[in-house]
UniProtKB/Swiss-Prot annotation:
It comes from Aquifex aeolicus (strain VF5). Its cofactor is Fe cation. Binds 1 Fe cation per subunit. It comes from the Bacteria. Fe cation binds at H28, H82, D164, H168. The keyword Iron applies. This is Superoxide dismutase [Fe]. InterPro entries: Fe/Mn_Superoxide_Dismutase, Mn/Fe_SOD, Mn/Fe_SOD_C, Mn/Fe_SOD_N, Mn/Fe_SOD_N_sf, SOD_C_sf. It catalyses: 2 superoxide + 2 H(+) = H2O2 + O2. One of its GO terms (molecular function) is superoxide dismutase activity. The keyword Repressor does not apply. Homotetramer. Keywords: Iron, Metal-binding, Oxidoreductase.
C-alpha cells in the first residue's frame, strides 16, 4: 500500500488581520496547523506498515489499528478545517455576500443577522469549531458545531464559513476571553472566498441530490 502524504499550504497563512495579531497567527499556523500535517503523515507511514498496524489484531476496545484510524480522522480534519479557516481570512474583510448567498441564507436561516447570531452562538457553545455549511443531501444551509476536529461532524456538510474556537486560536490576544475573538473573526471574513465556496457547493448538491434514492 502506498503512503499518501500531504504538504502544508503556506500561502494560506494570513497576516495583518484586524483584531487577530500576527503573534497569534504564528503559533496557530506554524505549530498547530503544521503539527496536524506532520502527524497525519506519520500516521500514514504507520498504516502502510502491515506489521505495525496488524489488521488481524483489530479490536473495538483497543488495537494499534483502531488508534491509528481514530487519530487519522483527528489529524486530517485538523488539517482540512484549519485550511478552510485560514483560507477565508483577509485583513479587515473583503467583499460582501453575493445575492445568491444572501437569498439562500434568508430562505434557510432567516437572514444574515440571524445567521451571524446562530454562528456566534455555536462558536461560544462548542469547544472546537463552528461551521456554516451546505448539507449535500438536503441542499440546506446548516450551522454545525464541533467539540473536536472529528467530533459531531455532519456527513455531507460542505463548509463555507469555518470558525476555530479552540483556545489556541485566540489565547495570545484574548487569553480565555472567546467573545472578542469571535467578533474579530467576523471583521476579517473574505466574502469572495465564501461566495466561491457556496457556488461550488451548490453545483455539488445539484450533481448529487439524487445520491440517496
Amino acid at each position: 500500500m502506498g503512503v499518501h502524504k500531504i504538504q502544508p499550504k503556506d500561502h494560506l497563512k494570513p497576516q495583518n488581520l484586524e483584531g487577530i495579531s500576527n503573534e497569534q497567527i504564528e503559533p496557530h499556523f506554524e505549530a498547530h496547523y503544521k503539527g496536524y500535517v506532520a502527524k497525519y503523515n506519520e500516521i500514514q507511514e504507520k498504516l502502510a506498515d502491515q506489521n505495525f498496524a496488524d489488521r488481524s489484531k483489530a479490536n473495538q476496545n483497543y488495537s494499534e489499528y483502531r488508534e491509528l484510524k481514530v487519530e487519522e480522522t483527528f489529524n486530517y480534519m485538523g488539517v482540512v478545517l484549519h485550511e478552510l479557516y485560514f483560507g477565508m481570512l483577509a485583513p479587515g474583510g473583503k467583499g460582501e455576500p453575493s445575492e445568491a448567498l444572501k437569498k439562500k441564507i434568508e430562505e434557510d436561516l432567516g437572514g444574515l443577522d440571524a445567521c451571524t447570531n446562530e454562528l456566534k452562538a455555536a462558536a461560544i457553545a462548542f469547544r472546537g469549531w463552528a461551521i456554516l455549511g451546505l448539507d449535500i443531501f438536503s441542499g440546506r444551509l446548516v450551522v454545525n458545531g464541533l467539540d473536536a476536529h472529528n467530533v459531531y461532524n455532519l456527513t455531507g456538510l460542505i463548509p463555507l464559513i469555518v470558525i476555530d474556537t479552540y483556545e489556541h486560536a485566540y489565547y495570545v490576544d484574548y487569553k480565555n476571553k472567546r467573545p472578542p475573538y469571535i467578533d474579530a473573526f467576523f471583521k476579517n471574513i473574505n466574502w469572495d472566498v465564501v461566495n466561491e465556496r457556496f457556488e461550488k457547493a451548490m453545483k455539488a448538491y445539484e450533481a448529487l441530490k439524487d445520491f440517496i434514492k
